[in-house]
Amino acid sequence: MTAATPDRRAIITEALHKIDDLTARLEIAEKSSSEPIAVIGMGCRFPGGVNNPEQFWDLLCAGRSGIVRVPAQRWDADAYYCDDHTVPGTICSTEGGFLTSWQPDEFDAEFFSISPREAAAMDPQQRLLIEVAWEALEDAGVPQHTIRGTQTSVFVGVTAYDYMLTLAGRLRPVDLDAYIPTGNSANFAAGRLAYILGARGPAVVIDTACSSSLVAVHLACQSLRGRESDMALVGGTNLLLSPGPSIACSRWGMLSPEGRCKTFDASADGYVRGEGAAVVVLKRLDDAVRDGNRILAVVRGSAVNQDGASSGVTVPNGPAQQALLAKALTSSKLTAADIDYVEAHGTGTPLGDPIELDSLSKVFSDRAGSDQLVIGSVKTNLGHLEAAAGVAGLMKAVLAVHNGYIPRHLNFHQLTPHASEAASRLRIAADGIDWPTTGRPRRAGVSSFGVSGTNAHVVIEQAPDPMAAAGTEPQRGPVPAVSTLVVFGKTAPRVAATASVLADWLDGPGAAVPLADVAHTLNHHRARQTRFGTVAAVDRRQAVIGLRALAAGQSAPGVVAPREGSIGGGTVFVYSGRGSQWAGMGRQLLADEPAFAAAIAELEPEFVAQGGFSLRDVIAGGKELVGIEQIQLGLIGMQLALTALWRSYGVTPDAVIGHSMGEVAAAVVAGALTPAQGLRVTAVRSRLMAPLSGQGTMALLELDAEATEALIADYPEVSLGIYASPRQTVISGPPLLIDELIDKVRQQNGFATRVNIEVAPHNPAMDALQPAMRSELADLTPQPPTIPIISTTYADLGISLGSGPRFDAEHWATNMRNPVRFHQAIAHAGADHHTFIEISAHPLLTHSISDTLRASYDVDNYLRIGTLQRDAHDTLEFHTNLNTTCLLYTSPSTRD
């Protein structure tokens, strides 16, 4: 007996483990059957000029109707009209819910890489669906390229075949090709969308007539809960392209002769057919919170059933509707008292309305102290969108729950007398209603009943408090001083069109959205196309001005237009000499850009030691640099800090070139000198030159080297100091002689002007300074550069020196005396490098760079830009130039 005891304990222990395992599995199963689903994005085209959810909400809140006379492009309303619906071949109404802002032939086939021939064969319902689905993803902040290869599903409601019927009557047998079936078979509505996006989840088309798109929502939620999908695009599409279906509906007695859906009203006499498309983007709530998605509402549960054997195949079944509503509440783990509003099917037929009212009154009779159930129907605004009706109702409910307002239900004056007395306890939203305060999340139900008997009901709930999910999205840091808006398009005209739309949105519906948030969405949550332009702006007004300029193909501060053609590889940082300084340079960067501020702070001790002044104080105070020493030290300090700024945004040099004293900064950036050594070289050079201040100057001439040599042949004290470009040179020498030569050139109708400098470097005047330069820098210990330096100090650019110049004392003595061979250095670099960025407080060399490249290469294959601009907004100017470099790549910088 004793020996058997451990066996019993083992059995009991094993049994308990199995119970725990089964309990855990049951909990998982229960969760998967009722897991909340987030609505994270929506797109639509509806009657009333509605192109997006914001415009849809505006229409609803304004109590507007989208019903219009049948457009002449569809059919001749008068030719088919007859007030007697029993007359064959006629229609008892001339009205409909037609799209006024989109036409079937407006599809942008090229954008979706669809050939014109294939697009022409496609049912316009498919064309419309593709565009709206794309916009829904944009609304969700899901870049379309991120869907490729993922378990993203597509569930679409489609019922009409107007286009195929039209083609069948028009095309001859010889006109039929492979595009006709693929363009008109309903299954391709989902399959083609999945193909365009590269989605790998289920792609299913549902046809349950009027309930198609809400049944699609139910199936999508099941797919998400079952882990068959990780995200779902769900919608419906419907276009009225032929009078045939309207003739049939009229004979059936379903259409309103007045052309209005008077849902639940005593005068209801039928519905108005409508067209449109809508798509919602769904995701498991936990995943949406984890990924930082904006959540518009949450699907708590849903149900689908069938009328079964009612009094007729098209007659609604009250008990079936009641069972559906009860099942949806059970699926949501809610009671009738938890629901505040129901977006009803509500077609406005004398038969269907009373049955639906009675079903609602019976299921929601037990309100347990809650306010009256409010009901309404979007069909009074849009008409009956048939396959798209369910998702249109869902969108209205989502917007109502999200905004805490129930829009007005149109065309209602007196409750239909055909409903039971209990229906009078329902509150029809004859006026707009602020959502009742209940102390719990706002909740709504959405019904959609198919004419063939398949019914759907979805229960939605207000999204959770965003603060509850704080920290789930990666922190974006402080709001940037300048925001960059990236505007994509497959072609430059499409970029312009998008910029125009975005400008209108920023000036209107998006006026309250922070500019930094707009930039973040555009830069991180939009599909990246082959062309893009950028607008950098410090505020909304400047952003709108920039976007309108981009749309018009005009220049404006902060605007970088799409670039045509390609740029080769290789980036050169070019460091100018004197002349780029100005009071206030870098002050805005010091406040806005941490990398720039950190570089200035790192250099500060050396400035105090070498120059006896604080560069930070000069920059922060917007002061002038005074005297040779301050100017030269201040410029190299700016150049090193600007280099750090470029590098902080991922732009780094493959080679460096220094112009005159700019070669010191180039040597530091290349690693040949430390910053302290670079400042020392600059301080020694400027200190030695200071006594010569006022004894020399320079002049820029629009002459090539040969003409300049001839010009100065009789002036031994004047030298050709700089080979600027193939057609420009700079001479150096005593002021009186330089002025005399300037006059000579001008007398020959040539261009000549003084350079703002008070000494004459690269001139025999420097000979006397060279020994002291060698002596004071004798202990300088440079290192081999880690980045190639193309030296402007030597006739052969330093190439004959094996591994290049040593950048020791001898080099810097030679640098101050020899002519600057800038033209030759740029021409040499142009063979392997295609981007030239001048690192300075104001561009002095970009013109010479362009001239030099143009003489030897196709200049359109090169980019030449500066960094800052005199008296301009530092941060804005830098980001504009940064954005210009981003056009070299297939995608822009991911920084905002």
Each model region followed by its residue ranges:
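Conserved adenylation A10 loop of the ANL superfamily
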Residues: 133, 576-579, 889-894
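Helix-rich "cap/lid" substructures immediately adjacent to catalytic or cofactor-binding pockets
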Residues: 187-190, 564-657, 661, 731, ...
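Acyltransferase loading domain of fatty acid and polyketide assembly lines
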Residues: 2-13, 33-36, 335-338, 380, ...
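Short, flexible loop segments at boundaries between secondary-structure elements
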Residues: 863-884
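Condensing-enzyme catalytic core of the thiolase-fold
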Residues: 2-477, 504, 526, 623, ...
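Short hydrophobic beta-strand that contains or immediately precedes a catalytic carboxylate
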Residues: 39-40, 574-575, 836-838
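Acyltransferase
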Residues: 301-302, 306-311, 598, 618-839, ...
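Short Gly/Thr/Asp-enriched flexible loops that form oxyanion-binding sites at enzyme active sites
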Residues: 352-357, 844-854
